[in-house]
Amino acid sequence: MSLGEGKLIYEGKAKRVYLINNEELVMEFKDEVTALDGARKEYAPGKGKLAASQTAFFMSYLNESGVRTHFINWDGDRRIHVRRLRMIPVEVIVRNYAYGSFIRRMPLIKPLTKFTTPLVEFHLKNDELHDPLILIEDIIEAGLTSMEQVMEIRSVSLKVNHLLSELLGKYGLTLVDFKLEFGVNSNGALVLADELSGDTMRVLMNGKHLDKELFRMGGSVKELIEAYSRLNSILGLGLKG
């Protein structure tokens, strides 16, 4: 399906967003990869299509499983058609295993220790401040959203974690952690937004990363594309970069 160009309204490290009309947007995934808050940036041919296909796969699955998402359809290439939302400037990280920034702030726990229950973290979405960890009370005091909506975000995030962990587990994959973003639609309902791909989740197959962690650890673009392609192959998406 071909998706129209629209008006460019946002460009970030990994995506461009185009306005189609008051209710709909197109998200275009770039053939670029960044790490270390953009300090390392390289051209990655085929990555956009791989990330878009993964997002389409996971978002479609969540839609079918009763989670309201912004996803409408995928053009078969680097673009997805989504619903326009009023975004909440908070990133949610759900952790099943100790890894990454969690280890840096809590070194008493060994890497890849499985948590007794999943952890849900809230981070202020702010590149200049490096998306700092914040409290629920911070969110309320800053007026970013209501306590009721924060609790709904937490509940939906845990549901998404359960669904994705179960799905990936069927393929022999381990979901270490992942990032979510949410928005509110014109009716005031909470909606899962942004993307779900190797860019925003850590997924292991027999202890090996099939996600952007490879690049963060100094791996090459070629290794990254091979990992994303491997994830697609395992999920039966039939795509290569």
UniProtKB/Swiss-Prot annotation:
One of its GO terms (molecular function) is ATP binding. It holds the Pfam family SAICAR_synt. Its EC number is 6.3.2.6. It catalyses: 5-amino-1-(5-phospho-D-ribosyl)imidazole-4-carboxylate + L-aspartate + ATP = (2S)-2-[5-amino-1-(5-phospho-beta-D-ribosyl)imidazole-4-carboxamido]succinate + ADP + phosphate + 2 H(+). Disulfide bonds: none annotated. GO terms for biological process: 'de novo' IMP biosynthetic process; cobalamin biosynthetic process. Belongs to the SAICAR synthetase family. PANTHER family: MULTIFUNCTIONAL PROTEIN ADE2, SI:DKEY-6E2.2. HAMAP family: SAICAR_synth. This is Phosphoribosylaminoimidazole-succinocarboxamide synthase. It comes from Caldivirga maquilingensis (strain ATCC 700844 / DSM 13496 / JCM 10307 / IC-167). The gene is purC.
